[in-house]
Amino acid sequence: MLSDRIGRKPIISIGMLGYTISLLLFGLASSFWTLFIARALSGILSSATSVASLAYVGDSSTEDERSKNMGQLGAAMSVGVMLGPLFGGILAGYSLALPFFTGAGISFIAFLLIVTVLPESIERSGYPHKKDSFDFLALKSMLLGPAGVILILIFIVNFCQTGLQGITGLYVVDKFGFTTGQVGVVWMVVAGVLIVVQGFFTGPLENKTGDKLLILIGIFCKALVAFAMVLTSGFISVLVVFGLFAVSSALTVPTLNASLSKAANQRKGILMGFASTAGNLSKVIAPLLAGYLYERSIELPYITMGAIALIGTIICFIWKKTVR
């Protein structure tokens, strides 16, 4: 909501500066409490950065380009997730503090670029800054419409993704005796597929099929992944199944964000904030449930996540049929 009032650029700028300060503190930390304060500061200053960034992409995109641009944003994040630990590990070989100082430098360069180069998207897209009071009735109307359905689907998708990711490392070790290297290869394949599909295919596919059908296919694939994991027999089959997992994530996440952006009109910031809250809530609950179920049976989390994904598929199918 704050980014709807004062603009996306200030929120993103503050967030990047927060990353810089937090990483510097991490590099200089000599006690647990310094680390704790640095992490808390990072969360306080940068928690809205991803939300404002998604809103910025929504502001700056036409409806036809929105899914493609959301996909490219997701691909860029996947590249960072894949390369960050790699370079961090290399730099840590020289000094444990060096990865943090390097990250702080990169974050500060990004901060300077945002301040000096990045235009304010709300002004560019013609949306006025919202200085007036919060319109609860307008928000309620949106949440009872398509935006509410999309938020439910975002929760379900994040819930299933987090649940599957959280227990798969244990599952493949307990069932097949995977080495840490084999587990790493699985996640490298997932990251690679995410980058390629989000970066090059999600947008064009959405333009051809429509957002609802693409989301429907993606969530159904998530259910197939969960059930198929119970039937896997070794390394190759796990790679294939989690390749499909990456495809389903690449199709659903950016398309859901793009659909929410379309439904938001001038309130992209607050709805993206709700989406972030739904996603974060699912990431708290899903690992707890998956871990509890895993203690009962190692296949039970997959069956449960598959059933939840099927519920999401049904919700999406009804949404597709009833909302034009």
Indicate residue ranges for each PLM-predicted region.
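C-terminal transmembrane helical hairpin of 12-TM major facilitator-type secondary transporters
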Residues: 212-256
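Helix-loop-helix hairpin linking two adjacent transmembrane segments in secondary transporters
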Residues: 73-115
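Paired small-residue
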Residues: 22, 33-41, 236-244
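Short amphipathic helix-loop junctions that connect adjacent transmembrane helices
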Residues: 167-182
